[in-house]
């Protein structure tokens, strides 16, 4: 099951994808975390995040060559929007905190009132009783995703964002 971050992923996209990756991996699913687009991740903070937290993020240079048989989950983006390379898949799910851009599937969870997609994924993991606190690297990634997408917490306003920060602090 591939989980796709938007092209040129930021800390929030990587953290959110990693949260879903850990959940599905621990459920025994064969899961991959990937992204496509023109550029590989090169920013120092992101390469360190991926390396130090053991995030298995893979770059697809030729995404059209590997169609997905089954479900593709896009995270921190919406399939068909301008910031994500389309990977052919028989089924699409979208998890995002941005306003609706494209209606591409019935399997969408959008919460544009949140400061980060990491908050949305953290909330979903809490709903599933997934023990984020048992995975220090995942907790760190989700915390950093929220930190970066809320301008170092200066734009925290939603109670769910505040709950995530407190829960991972």
Model-derived regions, located:
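Anionic-ligand anchoring segments at beta-strand to alpha-helix junctions in alpha/beta enzyme folds, i.e.
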Residues: 1-65
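A structured phosphate/pyrophosphate-recognition subdomain
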Residues: 1-8, 16-25, 103-169
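Generic detector of well-ordered alpha-helical packing
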Residues: 11-13, 77, 97, 150
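Short secondary-structure boundary/hinge segments and terminal tails
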Residues: 41-42, 67-69, 143, 163
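Short, well-ordered secondary-structure micro-motifs
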Residues: 44-45, 85, 105, 156
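Active-site cofactor/cluster-binding pocket
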Residues: 51-107
């Amino acid at each position: 099951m591939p989980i796709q971050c938007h092209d040129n992923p930021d800390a929030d996209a990587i953290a959110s994808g990693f949260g879903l990756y850990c959940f599905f991996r621990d459920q025994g699913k064969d899961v991959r975390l990937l992204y496509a687009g023109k550029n590989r991740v090169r920013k120092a903070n992101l390469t360190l995040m991926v390396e130090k937290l053991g995030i298995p993020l893979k770059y697809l240079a030729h995404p059209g060559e590997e169609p997905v048989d089954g479900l593709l989950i896009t995270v921190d983006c919406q399939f068909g929007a301008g910031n994500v390379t389309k990977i052919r898949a028989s089924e699409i799910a979208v998890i995002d905190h941005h306003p609706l851009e494209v209606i591409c599937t019935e399997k969408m969870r959008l919460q544009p009132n949140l400061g980060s997609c990491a908050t949305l994924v953290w909330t979903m993991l809490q709903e599933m009783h997934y023990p984020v606190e048992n995975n220090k690297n995942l907790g760190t990634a989700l915390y950093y995703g929220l930190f970066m997408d809320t301008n170092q917490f200066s734009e925290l306003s939603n109670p769910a964002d505040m709950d995530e920060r407190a829960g991972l602090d």
